[in-house]
A protein has these predicted regions:
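Cleaved targeting-peptide boundary
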Residues: 19-29
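Gram-negative bacterial Sec-dependent N-terminal signal peptides
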Residues: 1-19
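Extracellular/periplasmic metallocenter environments
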Residues: 30, 35, 41-49, 132-175
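A eukaryote-biased signal for short, well-structured alpha-helical docking elements
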Residues: 42-65
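N-terminal edge beta-strand
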Residues: 61-91
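Short aromatic-acidic-glycine turn motif
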Residues: 112-123
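Short beta-strand and strand-turn-strand segments in soluble, beta-rich domains
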Residues: 121-131
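Beta-strand cores of secreted/periplasmic/IMS beta-sandwich domains, seen most often
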Residues: 82-107, 143-151
Length: 175
């Protein structure tokens, strides 16, 4: 009984002390807390997630409304096995097959985002990577990408491995 009373008293005292020490914190500005007002945090991209683009975002875990089979080939073409009309708000499961003998990338974005990604790939050398809006597919292999289309209506699919898009490995779509 005595231990219970001591424990209860300690919890009460500790809780009160913590509450008192935090009570004025909300009212204090950055200056009052000794923080510089010259530096501010940029929260403009606070909601951005990996792979989010001007034309949509990854849709991991979502149920696709359409399935599109994509063929990447060494003749530097991106083809749909069967043509399909993709619309705004569609969730598309892309099944991407590399039918060639060299690596290819499948990237989703706006034309300006693809140019930016292409420049990054050139600067990095032939660095294969997967991200929310792009996958690199080895020869004879397949990968999947689940994508929710929204935003800009002009979409560009591209292989941004150096030299590939420049050789025509781009597919343009209008939603």
């Amino acid at each position: 009984m005595k231990k219970s009373l001591i424990t209860l008293a300690l919890i009460t005292i500790t809780g009160t002390a913590i509450a008192d020490s935090n009570s004025g914190h909300k009212e204090m500005g950055h200056n009052a807390m000794g923080h510089s007002t010259e530096m501010t945090m940029d929260h403009s991209n606070g909601m951005a997630m990996e792979g989010m683009t001007d034309v949509g975002m990854p849709a991991a875990g979502a149920k696709p409304t359409k399935v599109v089979h994509v063929l990447l080939s060494d003749d530097m073409k991106i083809r749909f096995k069967k043509e399909v009309q993709i619309e705004t708000n569609d969730v598309v499961q892309f099944v991407i097959m590399n039918t060639g003998k060299i690596d290819h990338e499948f990237s989703i974005g706006s034309a300006s985002e693809q140019i930016e990604h292409r420049e990054m790939m050139k600067a990095m050398g032939n660095h294969a990577h997967d991200s929310g809006n792009a996958v690199t597919v080895k020869p004879g292999k397949a990968k999947q990408l689940l994508w929710h289309f929204h935003g800009e209506k002009n979409v560009e699919l591209a292989c941004n491995i150096p030299g590939h898009a420049e050789s025509g490995m781009i597919k343009k779509m209008a939603l």
